[in-house]
Amino acid sequence: MSPAPWRPHDTGPIPVVGRPAPPSAAASRPTEVLPAGATLAPVELTGLPTTEQPVGKKPGRSGRDLGAAIGVALALGAVILLSLLVWRPAFLLVLTAAVVVATIELVRALRKGRFRPPLVPVLAGGPVMIGLAWSRGPTGLVAGFLITVLAVMLWRLAEGPVGYLRDAAAGVLVALYVPLLAGFAALMLVPDDGAARVVAFIVTVVCSDVGGFAAGVLFGKHRMAPSISPKKSWEGMAGSVSACMLAGVLLIGLMLGGPWWGGLIFGAAIAVTATIGDLGESLIKRDLGIKDMGDLLPGHGGLMDRMDSLLPSAAVAYLLLSLFAPA
């Protein structure tokens, strides 16, 4: 069998001497000239690590560094527990420091939007409210809040009328959201068994977060509020309620001598308020176009991001503990 004859590759028509070669297809297309000042659109390279996801480091299902989050949570829990066991007023110092930091974070976050709440009066009002709640009870807490609101309104007058209502309302929101609600934790600390009350409150809120996270990761399919918090599911909510009710029965019954059915109600209520607090802060962050209130705590964001479920739950916990386990 003879080999196939050799044939040259087709390189197009052979040019004729004295006649210009026909233009190629690429050369026949008109050249696009960018207008002055224009830039080429960036090309996105897929499959390469980004700055948000370092090489060799994968975030958890929650989108955060789970190891760092657990470590920070344990450290915070140890500080709170130690302050309650060693000397009860030491917890007031921890609470006051947390209120100051969370207030700064919230004011800075609001200023990234169109709000300009005055920082000085709300920052000074936090320790005042905590101290009056400890020394004067509910009346002192309310009085401290009213004094702070008046200070916010007067302080903002110095900047003129433009945006006054907007900024003063934002300042009142900060005073209500952080120091006023945190003051209920100070009220829980007042009775002789105040340390046990605070522990029961915090542990139940933690059970809400842990139960909701575990159930949401394992079984979450039906989104609760996709436009606010896409990762929250009704299955996770069921896990929060179940974990809180179990914790409520054990803590109210064993630590505070309350009825078991009171523990069920306490746990269910804390699960609801903790979820509302989480969703409420997520709504504020989405409105402001930010992911976290700060970056103080690795794996968590800011301190305000950890207090979002604690703050509204503190008021409900104080009221229900006063009802089911009166001092």
Predicted regions and their residues:
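Membrane-embedded alpha-helical bundles of polytopic integral membrane proteins
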Residues: 2-268, 272
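Hydrophobic transmembrane alpha-helices of multi-pass small-molecule transporters
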Residues: 244-245, 313, 322
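Membrane-embedded alpha-helical segments of transport systems
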Residues: 208-211, 238-239, 304-314
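Interfacial loop-to-transmembrane junctions
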Residues: 287-310
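Juxtamembrane boundary at the C-terminal end of a transmembrane helix
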Residues: 319-327
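Juxtamembrane C-cap of transmembrane helices in multi-pass membrane transport proteins
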Residues: 189, 284-289
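Alpha-helical transmembrane segments and their lipid-water interface positions
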Residues: 212-216, 281-285, 309-312
